[in-house]
Amino acid sequence: MVEVIDGGVTTPQGFKAAGVHSGVKYRSLDLALLYSETPATACVGYTSNNVKAAPVQVMMKENAEKLQAVVINSGNANALTGRRGIEDALEMKKVTANELGLDPLNVGVMSTGLIGRFMDMHKVRYGISRASRELFNGRQADANLAEAIMTTDTIKKECAVRVRLSDGTLVYIGAICKGSGMISPHMKVLHGTTLSLITTDANLSPAFREKWQRILDGSLNMVSVDGDQSTNDTSILLANGMAGGKVADDDPEFYEALNFVMTKIARTVAADGEGATKLIEVKVSGADTKDDAVKLVKTIINSPLVKSAIFGSDPNYGRIMMALGNSGCKFNLEDVRLTIKGGDMEVPILDSGAPVFQDERSVEVVRMAMDNKEVSILVDLGVGNETATGWGCDLTYDYVRINAEYST
């Protein structure tokens, strides 16, 4: 059974973290370092955007099966920076390796922030040196790392669980994530930004990468704040095996626990979308294929009209059906059922392709359901057995303001 506990990336055995101010940002913490006492099996998902940031290019090329440290800077994405950007990413790895006595190949690197600006490596080098001396474990270390990777995020995004595996081994999983804008990840293994670090003391092999892809596809890859996939999206799972026990690649208890952590992180990213006031959850069932279910979910959560309606608690369900029709997926309108859920209210809207209600009083009930911090849109296509769930947020005035003023 998965047990949620108070913790973050240093909760599993053997992990230490630091977050410091290097000067890339004016005041905030802006450089983070994660370290494992032993080399850890690394499973990594990267953005599938064709315009990839320098750190993503470097890590994809190296494709290391083991990592012992990850260095992250915020305030500068190191994207669209040409050869110099590649050299800067490599230098971040090298400086970190020298400070910790590691091989640079066992150091991961991530960046987030403004695109198209060169790194101030004097400040970054200073930050890495300082962070390497401040590595420790515990909640303050987790909090410092979480703060150091934030950009337009308004909250730290952390999660930790413990679970007993099938062989009796007690293992821990910790996670930290950032993401608020430019969020519509489509991360692939071996292929405003979502960066996530997941740590575990479970024993995993490099073959777990295939399962890691499936978990990403059902969690972070089902999040969309604005439909824009970042140049820097990266998600790193580190498993150092310090809990002992058998290889947990095929352990259903571990898979369930990791999937729980990633789903929780995904929901938190969506809820903290830039300017957001509401979390939107979209569940599609009865689809003919998995691809159709996923496409339908993404079409709904990416629709500016749907997002605006949720913001205003406007029961204009025609916008949801418009989005369904625009998805390109085939279905019979006569089979579709639509329900909106908010708080303890679950209101049928459409049945067999026709509205369940027409009177003003019923419309007000729908409005009340939508006037909650979390609104669920439930769509049953009635044609198959495939399902998908995704998360987004409402579109507010503040989203436009934040992005209009971002670089200033």
Feature-to-residue mapping (PLM):
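A structural signal for small-residue-enriched, beta-sheet-centric alpha/beta enzyme cores
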Residues: M1-D88, A97-T408
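Generic structural marker for isolated residues within well-ordered, non-membrane alpha-helices
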Residues: K93
